[in-house]
Amino acid sequence: MNIAVCDDQLEELKAVESLLRMWQEQQHAAVRLHLFQNAGALLEAARKERFTLYLLDVMMPGTSGMAAAREIRTFDSAADIVFLTSSPGFAYESYGVQALEYLLKPITAKKLFPLLSRLYLREQKPQE
């Protein structure tokens, strides 16, 4: 799995990174993790490298996570997008970018691990 995480709050970014590393160790999963504190840097990287999963904060200064997701969909329709946010107010809008999940902060192992496991298993299945 090639995962991009974007959150303008460093503490939140590090907390999600810690959860992802914990899941990776528990599952012995092959994961490449990329962390971004703004959507501009994320989008620049996403145009150069394909990520299989985007974990995006919704409310960020400058380009929001929702706007970043719309931009990602212009060049990558296959990647999974999951929003990690403190605001339930954008859940409906997330359908417009075919978001897989909309998780409310604080993000916990109980919320994140089943999702990661499901995606990892799907990725490991041979394509028919």
Language-model features, listed with the residues they occupy:
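Non-catalytic signal-transmission and effector/linker regions of two-component phosphorelay proteins
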Residues: M1-A4, K14
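Short, surface-exposed amphipathic charged segments that create phosphate/polyanion-binding patches used
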Residues: A4, K48-R50
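Helix N-cap/capping motif at the beta->alpha junctions
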Residues: L35-A41, G65
